[in-house]
Amino acid sequence: MPINTDRILTTHVGSLPRSERLIRANAARRDGSIDEADFQKILTEETQAVVDRQVEIGIDIVNDGEYGHAMSQAVDYGAWWHYSFARTGGLKLLTEGNPANEVHRSEPGKLKYTSFADRRDWTRFQDFYTAELDLGNDPDRSFPVAVAPLTYQGQDEVGRDVRNLAAATDGKGAHSAFVAALSPGSAARVGNLYYPTDKEHIYAWADVLKEEYKAITDAGFTLQIDDPSVAEGWDQINPEPSVSDYLDFIQVAVDALNYALEDIPTEQTRFHLCWGSWHGPHSTDLEFKHLADTLLSIDAAGYTFEAANARHAHEWKVWENLELPEGKYVIPGVVSHSTNLIEHPELVAQRIEQFAQVVGKENVVASTDCGLGGRLHPDLAWAKLESLATGARIASERLFG
């Protein structure tokens, strides 16, 4: 069944600007200065407010803004990942000796992630990344290491998230709603001092995360899998590998994800591909044409990906040579998180029409490139969503009459 029947539906990738009230509450919760019941009341009320605003603007497929993924400051590029740390047992913070910080040099057929600081784009533009890039300044943010069997301990948190979203969307007129969750491949980017192999580490994360996936879909929501590692991991292999070696390397994570999705309804699943949401040059982004077949092999109904920013806007033409499987749909970004410029609604409409030409108007949902929360000033983020909704209405009039 096509996703669209009489118009282009709209959505976004997940993270929306946290309200000042929620940011203050998250900070207070972390330092123990707020009662838990008071915090939960604030979270519930702010989730309602962010859903109401999406519906008011004209977003059809809404979410909770990822408000359950805590941010205690306005600029935060990592809440989509960091939230998983508190929901997983078997992790430990180390003051030194974190293997994720080690520099590695890969060889043909023997690829291994190097450290984040040793990424090829980051070393090429070292002065920019050192002096200009603001990823948020959270002195308490540390990355854990797997030191024991991984277990899922986020039942209460995910239960709270789906209850808040269910209450917030009840009777509000949204088309549907989704909840974002981390992929095994991205989760396994933390250090590992327990599992003998990287494959065992990734599959351990798959066993952990499939519990969260099931809780989301059992609640009736669409599950969005966030997995930047499929695309942006390319930049973290140093030196640059062959494309074939890289695709073989990420296949383990793709297989682990499909394993975790075995009991999840495909029609309730969408997958998010991106090249990392930081405001950097992205000169080493792997071209989408190399990733398209891998993307379509993932057991999801919808595929969301960057298609509006200066590095990837031209790649809509790749879909001219791809066959979108029956029952699948695309969710291209038609406004971007990477610039403060507000996209004109006519440009948004043109971008939607480009995808409609190559995959069919019934199979396109208009979206953002990546999450907007923590990456743009809140006023700009909401203005971009307004432009997205207006552009979708323009495209709908031309495509559906």
Would you name each region that the model predicts?
Residues 1-401:
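Domain-level signal for soluble alpha/beta catalytic cores
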